[in-house]
Each structure stands twice: as C-alpha cells, then as structure tokens.
C-alpha cells in the first residue's frame, strides 16, 4: 500500500517540502534561521491578530487602547510584549539569515535571493508601520521623519508625502491606513515566503562548502525536523527571557508618552534594527543623497551576485574574504551604535567613515579579495 503522505495532493506537497525533501548532510546551524523566520512570522501573525481585536486605530484612542490591552485584557501585556519583542527576534534572525547567504554564497540562487530581498523590504515596511500604531511620541515623530524623506524625490515628492499622509501632516488618516497596511502585509509576506521556498526547492539547499551535494543527501525528516525543533526551543527561550524579564529593553521610553505634534523629542530614532540604515541616511548632508544611500544600503544586496568574482562559491576556504566579511559585520554594529547617538562631533565622523567602509567593502574590497584569492589558487 502506498504511504498516505504520498497520494493526496496537499499531503504530497507537504511531504516533498518537509519530509522526503533531499537535504545536504552537512548544513550547519546557520541553516536554521529560515525555519526560525517562519516561526517568528507565525508568532507575529497570531499575537498581532489578538492585539487587533482590542486595538483602535484612531488618534484619540490608539494610545489608551494599547494601555487597555496591557492593563485590562487577559494576558494582554504578554501578547503585546511578545509582539513587540517578537519583531526584534524576527530581525535578528533576518540579519543572520542574510549574513549566512552572503558568507556561503547562497546568493547565486538568483530567484530565491531576489524574492528574499523583496521579503526583507516587506518586513521592514511592516515593522515601520507597526511602530507607528501605539501612537506614542516616537511613533508619531518617527512616522513624520521617515515619511518626510519621500519629499526629497524631485518634482513629485511633496505631493507624494501628502498623499501618503492623507492630509497635511501625520494624523488620523495616516494612522488608520498604516493599521490597514500593517494588518495585510504579513499575509502578503506569508505568500512571498511560499514563493521563496518554491524557488529554493527548484535547486535544493546550498551547504557550507559551497560544493554541489547531490551525491550526499539525507531526508529532511527526521534529521532536520528535530534540528529545527531545537532551534525553535532556543528562540522561544530567548524571546520569553526578553518578554518576561526586560520587555522594554529594546524599546524607547519616549513611546510611553502620548503623541504630541507640538513637542518634539530631543532624539528622534527608529527601533534598533533600523539604526544602521538610519546612520547611513544621516551621514550624508544632502537630503536626496541621504535617501538614496538609505535605499541603496539594502538594495545593494541585489548587486552582490553580480560582484561574485571568486572561483569558489562559499567563503569557507577564502581567508581574505572571511576577514572582510567580519569587518563588514563589525562595521554594521558600529553603524547601529552611531544611529542611536546624537548628531555631535565624534559621532558624525565615525558614521561617515563607517558608511563609506560599508559600501567600499561590498562594492570594491570583496570583489578585489576574490580576484586575489583566485590568483593565489593558480600560484
């Protein structure tokens, strides 16, 4: 008798994706982040759904509705902090996942990589709009500053900003539409994830060596199902530690003050996961230039596959590229730190140097290192 999982069309899809999927035998813990991102997305959709049951997207009541969730709703505080810190875990996993892709040359799967970049943009947009919803000081001013960047677009800028706002400033219309978009986008993200996986399963997974592993495959279940479950446990443990011990560690105290258009906070800054891009934006004195640098800081990922000069796919056997990769990681951490600092003397210069270094490593130094490594191989 044919196994039940191999005949019904739906179970067949599940079987080919999660059970009988041939996977490389040597993929490390860096390959866990894909499934962890799936878990994060599910946590966010579920907690978000329950928050939306009690939230009101109106400037007069938004802030107090969040307070009501935390004080009066059964386990409302838990749902709210799971959602807020779940976003942080989401971005930690995202950056690790992208970093893995760069280190091991996974970007050579062009379709998967490009869908991944679209996913990254979609998640960033969702997180930004979600941050506006509690309608605290940082929500309001963050929305004002970031949407205002679009006014740098020549000719149509101002019109575009007012169109997004639904008026002449960030107000009720803006909050309502941001809530609508924040609700719908995660489901679009879920659909994109399916396409991401569809393209990945066309080629199969990469592995740390970067060498085709067709001759050495193992079934996904039980080997990688149990490995993913271990990853889930670690992620949930870290998330619960954050939520139950210091839920406001990564948040901004200013967001506990209701939004006031007449009072600007001393330091307007986004959530920690956007600080590196914010630092790049601020390091350029020109508005349009800053916006272009901001967009390019993420869009540069799309150029990486075309800058791959090495004869090897992975960085596993490329020491010069490895050093550059870890300098890039340190540079991103530096930018994250600078993004949270005031615009004052040493920080401005550090930010500018770090921004130049960021683009230089990706566009110039890494391709050069690859060419040098190719020469060393010949020699």
Swiss-Prot record:
Co-factor binding details: Binds 2 heme b groups non-covalently.
PROSITE patterns cross-referenced by the UniProt entry: CYTB_CTER, CYTB_NTER
GO terms for cellular component: mitochondrial inner membrane; respiratory chain complex III
Misc note: Heme 1 (or BL or b562) is low-potential and absorbs at about 562 nm, and heme 2 (or BH or b566) is high-potential and absorbs at about 566 nm.
Membrane topology: Multi-pass membrane protein
InterPro entries referenced in this protein's UniProt entry, alphabetically: Cyt_b/b6_C, Cyt_b/b6_C_sf, Cyt_b/b6_N, Cytb/b6-like_sf, Cytochrome_b, Cytochrome_b_C_euk/bac, Cytochrome_b_N_euk/bac, Di-haem_cyt_TM
Family named by the database record: Belongs to the cytochrome b family.
The entry's keywords: Electron transport, Heme, Iron, Membrane, Metal-binding, Mitochondrion, Mitochondrion inner membrane, Respiratory chain, Transmembrane, Transmembrane helix, Transport, Ubiquinone
Subcellular location(s) per record: Mitochondrion inner membrane
One GO BP annotation of this record: mitochondrial electron transport, ubiquinol to cytochrome c
Alphabetized GO MF terms: metal ion binding; ubiquinol-cytochrome-c reductase activity
Subunit organization: The cytochrome bc1 complex contains 11 subunits: 3 respiratory subunits (MT-CYB, CYC1 and UQCRFS1), 2 core proteins (UQCRC1 and UQCRC2) and 6 low-molecular weight proteins (UQCRH/QCR6, UQCRB/QCR7, UQCRQ/QCR8, UQCR10/QCR9, UQCR11/QCR10 and a cleavage product of UQCRFS1). This cytochrome bc1 complex then forms a dimer.
Residues given in the record as heme b b566 binding sites: 97, 196
Protein name listed in UniProt: Cytochrome b
TM annotation in the entry: 33-53, 77-98, 113-133, 178-198, 226-246, 288-308, 320-340, 347-367
One Pfam family matching this protein: Cytochrome_B
Function: Component of the ubiquinol-cytochrome c reductase complex (complex III or cytochrome b-c1 complex) that is part of the mitochondrial respiratory chain. The b-c1 complex mediates electron transfer from ubiquinol to cytochrome c. Contributes to the generation of a proton gradient across the mitochondrial membrane that is then used for ATP synthesis.
PANTHER family tied to this protein: CYTOCHROME B (PTHR19271:SF16)
Residue positions binding a ubiquinone: 201
Positions annotated to bind heme b b562: 83, 182
Cofactor(s) recorded in Swiss-Prot or TrEMBL: heme b
Biological source species: Lepus townsendii
Classification of source organism: Eukaryota, Metazoa, Chordata, Craniata, Vertebrata
